[in-house]
Amino acid sequence: MPTPRKIETVSTLTEKLNRAQLVVVADYRGDGKGMSVADMTELRRKLREHGGEVVVAKNTLLKIAAHNTGHEALDPLLAGPTAVTLGYDDVSKVAKALLDYLKSGNKSFTVRGALLGNTLLPADALEQVTKLPSREQALAQVVGGIAAPVSGVVGVLNAAISNVLYVLQARIDQLQPQGETA
């Protein structure tokens, strides 16, 4: 029988997994002795600055939450001591903050894999995620792609109207006697 605390934990994890655009699964005891509280606090602070967070929970509860959200692909990654990094808004910034932390020399935190949207990625693909455009950049590219043809049409229509006006002005100039001006 599930306890109320476990039910609440699964509910919270389900909500967080639903919101997350990026889910990175890692072992937080990679070198055997595990991460210190100070290291985990530093990682959490860095991720929070970029719209992410780290959650440590039991694998069984994470699996239930993953199944609740349709992220069954996470199942093979959920074994052993597991920390889940969640990126909510700008996934490239969250991935970069995580990679920067990993490159700082902490061997206790080793990435097993990631889920970007509904795509399962191997651990080494996290670097590619850092190269994705931010949400604002992606929206700007989409708007630019949509606006470019529209501005081209406006330019063509504007040129056509101007050409008609130039032809009319030339005809008026032809019809007027040489001494008069319009």
From Swiss-Prot:
Gene Ontology MF annotations: large ribosomal subunit rRNA binding; structural constituent of ribosome
InterPro entries, A to Z: Ribosomal_uL10, Ribosomal_uL10-like_sf, Ribosomal_uL10_bac, Ribosomal_uL10_bac_type
Biological processes annotated in GO: translation
Gene3D superfamilies: 3.30.70.1730, 6.10.250.290
Keywords of this entry: Ribonucleoprotein, Ribosomal protein, RNA-binding, rRNA-binding
Transmembrane segments annotated in the record for this chain: none
Signal peptide: none
Gene Ontology CC entries for this record: cytosolic large ribosomal subunit
Pfam families reported in the protein's UniProt record: Ribosomal_L10
UniProt key word DNA-binding: no
HAMAP family: Ribosomal_uL10
Quaternary context: Part of the ribosomal stalk of the 50S ribosomal subunit. The N-terminus interacts with L11 and the large rRNA to form the base of the stalk. The C-terminus forms an elongated spine to which L12 dimers bind in a sequential fashion forming a multimeric L10(L12)X complex.
NCBIfam families (UniProt xref): PRK00099.1-1 (NF000955)
Family: Belongs to the universal ribosomal protein uL10 family.
Protein task: Forms part of the ribosomal stalk, playing a central role in the interaction of the ribosome with GTP-bound translation factors.
Protein name, per record: Large ribosomal subunit protein uL10
Biological source species: Chloroflexus aurantiacus (strain ATCC 29366 / DSM 635 / J-10-fl)
Species classification: Bacteria, Bacillati, Chloroflexota, Chloroflexia, Chloroflexales
